[in-house]
Amino acid sequence: MLTLTNIKKVFKTDEVETWALQNVNLEVKKGEFVAIMGPSGCGKSTLLNILGLLDTPTEGAYILDGKDVSQMSEDDRTDLRKGKLGFVFQSFNLIDELNVSENVELPLLYMGVPKKERRQKVKEVIERVAMTHRAQHFPSQLSGGQQQRVAIARAVISRPHIILADEPTGNLDSKHGKEVMDLLCELHKEGTTIIMVTHSQHDANYADRIVNLFDGEVVSEVEMWEADQTNPADPPPTPPCMEGSGYN
């Protein structure tokens, strides 16, 4: 589905150059759940921004569904982002002046979806995240877990192929964090590709694969079924997300 080849990212000021990413090579297959881990400042969010077409690499190639997006115009990148990608952020990024339904509806407005179709889709996705009873409430009236469920509803309403999640449980307690991770798992089971940046080993345990970054480089990749398999002769175990094991 997507391939990064020798991706580099440098941030320049008048006095210094800071290399955020160096020679990153990464492939994510359709339907995979990949967790990206590493210490603060290692380049995780920069990598996610490049994957999400919110930033461009200084060097290297990014192929998404067979297209070299690093060579696209900004307008073409925006169109591709709207059609294929959904975003979930640690800080929720809901608009305070809009209620739950209106926040969830926003991506469809930008896509020019007719009003009647928008309303039906909003109703369905809000029900999916168990927020129907809060549809007319504003973000300030919701708990952190409820706000993140609304953010996920907004991310998936356009049926994106890929969800990019940046510390989706970072502002939540363990109970609400589990609810959010279980919801991401449901989407993964339905075939959505998920790429998640996290500091939490608990959350990473939901993934099929963990990619570890250090100082802007990929230093290791771990297939979770391999990590759990003690006897190579045994059949591969069920991927962790399919078992919902992250907070057990």
What are these regions (language model features)?
Residues 1-207:
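ABC family nucleotide-binding domain
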Residues 209, 217-242, 246-248:
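Conserved beta-strand-loop-alpha-helix hinge in the C-terminal portion
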Residues 214:
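A cytosolic small-molecule/anion-sensing beta-strand core signal
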